[in-house]
Regions:
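Gly/Ala-rich beta-loop-alpha elbow adjacent to hydrolase catalytic centers
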Residues: 95, 99, 103
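Active-site loop/oxyanion-hole signature of alpha/beta-hydrolase fold enzymes
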Residues: 53-94, 130, 279
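Conserved loop-alpha-helix segment in the C-terminal half of the alpha/beta-hydrolase fold
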Residues: 44, 222-265
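Catalytic active-site module of serine/aspartate enzymes centered on a nucleophile-bearing elbow/loop
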Residues: 253-290
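Conserved alpha/beta-hydrolase catalytic His-Asp/Glu region
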Residues: 151-225
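Flexible "cap/lid" loop of the alpha/beta hydrolase fold
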Residues: 108, 117-150
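N-terminal cap/lid segment of alpha/beta-hydrolase-fold proteins
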Residues: 1-10
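Conserved HGGG/HGGXW glycine-rich cap/lid loop of the alpha/beta-hydrolase fold
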Residues: 9, 15-62
């Protein structure tokens, strides 16, 4: 674990593997996610073969407190400086949800730096979200953006473990419930004590009443490296049609892009089907980084 000061704020980085191995960066999702949580199974598996850096995005995990709005542009600025401080000149990125969206945007801006991408259900692929107007009204209602942290921080460990199980797709369960419960408890307390919103500014900034203010489809067209796109078959957050369209766009300029759908998994598929997710990622990197 390393603590960096980046653009005036703290960034926590978990590092594993040998420095002479190919470097891979992992970027987690939004809301109550952090590196220790979503990459619980993948991080150690990658560390046996590669030089791995799992970065806590600002206002997640060990990367707090932060002041001001952390929109797309500011997060990209912070990540770019973080990569520079870590001495990463050419590397691969694995991103999930918000982390996948950030990976797409960085790869489109700096194609010479990215060797390959793995995108677990990246954010930013659609024009709408389900219940768009209701979501927008929720965001605009005073007090709603911190409602969950105020509720969750009062929970005892058994209730947090029960909450953990509810985010897993039916028929799947956490392999390490005690450890993941402790991590989730840390994240809940961190959000509450730092007075953070439940949702990230990256998400909030996209929501309008009837459509999303931006998507990353043009950036997807700019991806030049081999890319593995992974979706949980039962996911309700990123649609199959959105993933298929993105893969087709990525292929337009001749880039290698492949979509794999993992059965009996949802949005957090690295935790729901860790053995299959790990196998797909390792096979892809063995092919593209060898």
């Amino acid at each position: 674990k390393r603590m960096l000061t980046v653009c005036g704020g703290p960034v926590c980085v978990y590092e594993a593997g040998e420095s002479n191995c190919a470097p891979i960066v992992l970027l987690h999702g939004a809301m109550y996610d952090e590196s220790r949580f979503i990459w619980d199974a993948l991080f150690p598996a990658l560390g046996e073969r590669y030089h791995v850096f799992a970065i806590d995005t600002p206002r997640h995990g060990g990367s707090r407190p932060w002041e001001g709005e952390l929109d797309r542009a500011r997060l990209l600025e912070i990540l770019t400086e973080t990569f520079s401080l870590l001495g990463l000149d050419r590397f691969s990125i694995i991103g999930l949800s918000m982390g996948g969206g950030l990976a797409i945007e960085f790869a489109s801006l700096h194609p010479e730096k990215i060797a390959s991408l793995v995108l677990f259900e990246p954010g930013g692929l659609g024009e709408h979200v389900d219940l768009q107007l209701i979501t927008w009204l929720y965001l605009k209602t005073p007090g709603m953006l911190r409602m969950l942290s105020r509720r969750y921080v009062k929970l005892q460990d058994p209730a947090i473990e029960k909450l953990l199980f509810t985010i897993f797709t039916k028929g799947t369960k956490p392999q390490n419930p005690a450890r993941l419960t402790a991590i989730l408890k840390d994240e809940i307390r961190g959000k509450f004590e730092c007075g953070e919103n439940d949702m990230d500014d990256w998400q909030i900034g996209a929501i309008a009443p009837f459509h999303l203010k931006w998507n990353l489809l043009e950036q997807v067209r700019s991806i030049a490296c081999p890319t593995l796109w992974l979706r949980g078959e039962k996911s309700t957050l990123v649609k199959q049609s959105e993933m298929e369209r993105a893969v087709a766009l990525a292929r337009e300029n001749g880039a290698q892009a492949e979509l794999k759908v993992i059965p009996n998994a949802g949005h957090i598929l690295p935790l729901e089907q860790p053995e299959q997710a790990n196998a797909e990622v390792l096979a892809f990197f063995d092919q593209t980084l060898s």
